Amino acid sequence: MSNWNIWSVPILIIALVIITPILAILYSAFLGDTSLWPHLFSTVLPRYILNTLILMFGVGSLSLVLGVSTAWVITRYNFLGKNILEWALLLPAAVPAYIIAYAYTDFFEYAGFFQGMLRDIFGWESAKDYWFPNIRSMGGAILVMSSVLYPYIYLMTRASFLTTPISFYQTSSIYGRNTFMYVAIPLARPGIMAGLALVLMETISDFGTVDYFALDTLTLGVFNVWLGMNSLSGASQISSVLFIFVIMLLTLEYLARRKQRFHEKSSGQNTMLEQEVSSAGKLICLLICLVPLILGFIIPVSILLNFVLNGFAIIDFEEIIRTTFSSIFLSLSASTFIMLISLLMIVVAN
């Protein structure tokens, strides 16, 4: 009790408020009607878990590639447009995944602009004349969600690269080792894993995208069992499986950053120096950064802007202004509240 003080009271209240909904769900899952457990295990639950794992693996892998590669290129190399791309790469995080799912489906489906253009160019008359991947599929969901979630990994990995002491990079150069593989990645592991944990938690909690793409995941299963079978206990039981996933992710993130400490004892330059590359190298760096930006922001926003222009005459501007101000007020209020609570908890913890 030596660490107990007056600030511990509000922290305890906040913790109780946060944990109460979780306890309510666990109570409903294990102390409510448990007769549905055997039915769930023998029918839908294995499929929900498998699809969730596939989605997590796909989104996590692609987000890692996009996030880490862009973070390294932006931090390490000097090329045209770097200062703009450094912040532009965060823009996809502002677009909800389900909105991009709607936009991509309208653009790439059989009746959409892209396939229509291909049929006009090559003279194809029906879907039997050619093959085109179905955007409303597991692969499509992985692409859509990765294109908006990679900024979590990009932001945290770039912060790790920037805060790694320059002496570590210099040492790798002296011994002729690959700086990226042997220094940057191992030392950025806590940041990478923290970003990956956020990406995966966003993935398993997503409802809009998986519902629109008709993917049977645990999150969609919660709503199907709750509303379709009118079983709150069954929905709570599926939610408890989601809790297991979240706890595993938090544990992995903790293990990744445990004992990861280093200190720069020398004075002088403490951050990585930008490296000049050839013209071809600059082009490659530019393409690496443009690909996720195009996939996650430029293409979907262009499609949405086209919708706006085509339906400009029927737009209800009063409704848009009202909902815009409501969204801004809600986001500012929530972010301010979360920031204050987080600062309070950090101060008390330290």
Descriptions of predicted regions:
Residues 35-39, 86, 119-123, 166-174, ...:
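Short amphipathic alpha-helical coupling elements at transmembrane boundaries
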Residues 38-39, 160-161, 211-212, 224-225, ...:
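Short alpha-helical segment immediately N-terminal to, or the first helix within
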Residues 77, 162-188, 215:
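Short helix-to-coil transition segments within interhelical loops
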Residues 204-230:
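Glycine-rich helix-loop "coupling/hinge" segments at transmembrane-helix boundaries
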